[in-house]
């Protein structure tokens, strides 16, 4: 029962992390224009993501444009794209395996050991999905930080962390935590000869052969 509860907790945590990974991948606010220094002179907020760039007017109107060329993109954007897409695919496969392998489902009840291994495989894939997301988000954030503190970067061209990065960090943490819980629910190994054998006692003293006593008395010549 304890393992079943831990599996459910891990599954819902990892599932929430996977949904967050999808949201982080789709959001265009991976970095946003900084309002430090003289950059506040403009009333337009700029956002850039993995798939598009957006401009937000002070009136609330937002205009987005998809990137025209794949090859013209920077290497870190292409790498982040690949890692996030791989994380989404791994999370989908992990979700299916976890549902099949959890004890609360009826699939594969005839083989509990194999069922537990399937659940562990799902947890491992959730871990990989979280690590891919963590790598992509942290790498992107590092480059944004380097550009921000680069003296050659104009003040009005500097960017800060966007909401998508924080969503990605939180989602990666949930996926890693949930996957760890699923991996901790290891199936108990089957014990050979688990059926107790009946106890056999040795032969009782009552079944032993009777001991014949020989008379050692000596009679005289007259039989007295």
UniProtKB/Swiss-Prot annotation:
Disulfide bonds join 54-64. It is a multi-pass membrane protein. One of its GO terms (molecular function) is paracellular tight junction channel activity. Residues 1-7, 103-117, 182-224 are cytoplasmic. Keywords: Cell junction, Cell membrane, Disulfide bond, Membrane, Sensory transduction, Tight junction, Transmembrane, Transmembrane helix, Vision. It is found in: Cell junction, Tight junction; Cell membrane. GO terms for cellular component: apical junction complex; basolateral plasma membrane; bicellular tight junction; cell junction; cytoplasm; mesaxon; nucleus; paranodal junction. Its main location: other. The keyword Disulfide bond applies. Gene3D superfamilies: 1.20.140.150. Residues 29-81, 139-160 are extracellular. The chain crosses the membrane at residues 8-28, 82-102, 118-138, 161-181. It catalyses: Mg(2+)(in) = Mg(2+)(out); Ca(2+)(in) = Ca(2+)(out); Na(+)(in) = Na(+)(out); K(+)(in) = K(+)(out). GO terms for biological process: actin cytoskeleton organization; apical junction assembly; bicellular tight junction assembly; cell adhesion; cell junction assembly; negative regulation of cell migration; negative regulation of cell population proliferation; negative regulation of gene expression. InterPro entries: Claudin, Claudin_CS, PMP22/EMP/MP20/Claudin. Can form homo- and heteropolymeric tight junction strands. Interacts with other claudins including CLDN3, CLDN10, CLDN16 and CLDN18 with highest affinity for CLDN16. Interacts (via PDZ-binding motif TRV) with TJP1 (via PDZ domain). Forms paracellular channels: coassembles with CLDN16 into tight junction strands with cation-selective channels through the strands, conveying epithelial permeability in a process known as paracellular tight junction permeability. Involved in the maintenance of ion gradients along the nephron. In the thick ascending limb (TAL) of Henle's loop, facilitates sodium paracellular permeability from the interstitial compartment to the lumen, contributing to the lumen-positive transepithelial potential that drives paracellular magnesium and calcium reabsorption. PANTHER family: CLAUDIN. Belongs to the claudin family. This is Claudin-19. The gene is Cldn19.
């Amino acid at each position: 029962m304890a393992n079943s509860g831990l599996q459910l907790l891990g599954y819902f945590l990892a599932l929430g992390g996977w949904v967050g990974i999808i949201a982080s991948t789709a959001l265009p606010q991976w970095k946003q224009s900084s309002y430090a220094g003289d950059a506040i002179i403009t009333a337009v907020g700029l956002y850039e993501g993995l798939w598009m760039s957006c401009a937000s007017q002070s009136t609330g109107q937002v205009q987005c444009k998809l990137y025209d060329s794949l090859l013209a993109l920077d290497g870190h954007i292409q790498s982040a794209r690949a890692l996030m897409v791989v994380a989404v695919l791994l999370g989908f496969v992990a979700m299916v395996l976890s549902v099949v392998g959890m004890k609360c489902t009826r699939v594969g009840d005839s083989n509990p050991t194999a069922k537990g291994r399937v659940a562990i495989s799902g947890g491992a894939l959730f871990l990989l999905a979280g690590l891919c997301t963590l790598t992509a988000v942290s790498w992107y954030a590092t480059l944004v930080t380097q550009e921000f503190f680069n003296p050659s970067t104009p003040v009005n061209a500097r960017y800060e962390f966007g909401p998508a990065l924080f969503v990605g960090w939180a989602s990666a943490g949930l996926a890693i935590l949930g996957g760890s819980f699923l991996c901790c629910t290891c199936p108990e190994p089957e014990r050979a000869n688990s059926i107790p054998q009946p106890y056999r006692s040795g032969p009782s003293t009552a079944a032993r052969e009777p001991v014949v006593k020989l008379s050692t008395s000596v009679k005289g010549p007259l039989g007295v």
